[in-house]
Amino acid sequence: MTDLDLAALYRLARAASDLGHYNLSKLLNVAAVSVVNRAAWSGSPLTTDRALAEAVAALEPQLRAAQLDQHLLGALQRARETVAAGQLVSYEEAPIIYVCRVCGAVAQTTPPEQCPYCGAGQLVFQLIPATFYLESAAVPIVMAQLARTPNWLEAIFSGLTETQAARRVDGHEGEWSLHEAAGHLLDTQELIALRVQLFLEHESPNLNAKALWQSIESARWSAADIVSKFRLSREAMLIQLRSAPADCWSRSGQHVEFGPVTLQQQCTYFAKHEHWHMAQMRRIRQAL
């Protein structure tokens, strides 16, 4: 399906909604999202910051030709330059941003009471998060998912030797071994445990950014050690969360990349992140 066909699919979804056929609109929107995700999954991944920046730069003339919002185009160019320099794009460089669901107008920081282009009211503006990881799930769901990961992680290594666990398998995410993927999850668990502690101790904690990549230290440990350390850290964190006051979940910390982040968002982020890596680790296990 071409990009033009994809736009036509979204137009059909809009037409169905305008005519009152909301469930048909829903199905058409699902089809469009499925097409996008399938294309992203099957395409050749960009594995370096430089390659990503070059791909964005190559797309910029088409975006300008589409007459997109000038502030958006400027922000994209600055963000691309930041990535090319090997840096993360900060929240200050890319703050809260909204898109009008009616006409596609862009609004930064706060949606206007009335869209200056189509006249739609403020409530039709769609907030675009930095990542779907930050879209909060209900606390009981998040807690249940965080609690299940240690058992899942233990099961994925069941019956494997250390040699098998260390064998790298190429894929959409690049070459990873189960040992490296589990080490990455342990690294991120230590990070979320630290941030949970910060939320419990402070009303508005400073959530210092940290790259979520494989911990060098975990390379020295066996797979069994990684799984054990993950379980101990996760279970201790869950005890803290279960005893936390209800209002603690709505506390908001400050993150250099994401801006304001609540405890609920932070825990949702890491639960979803683990679910994302489950697909990767299942694929690696099947290839061994």
Predicted regions and their residues:
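Acidic/histidine-rich alpha-helical segments that form the ligand environment
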Residues: 40-41, 47-81, 99, 152-160, ...
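Hydrophobic packing residues in well-ordered alpha-helices of helical domains and bundles
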Residues: 146, 178, 223-230, 267-270
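A short small-residue
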Residues: 130-133, 211-219
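Long, charge-rich boundary regions
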Residues: 6, 36, 42, 128-199
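Short cysteine-rich clusters marking metal-coordination/redox-active sites
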Residues: 100-103, 115-118
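Short, contiguous alpha-helical
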Residues: 58-97, 109, 122-129, 165-211, ...
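General detector of N-terminal leader/presequence modules that precede the first folded domain
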Residues: 1-42, 150, 154, 234
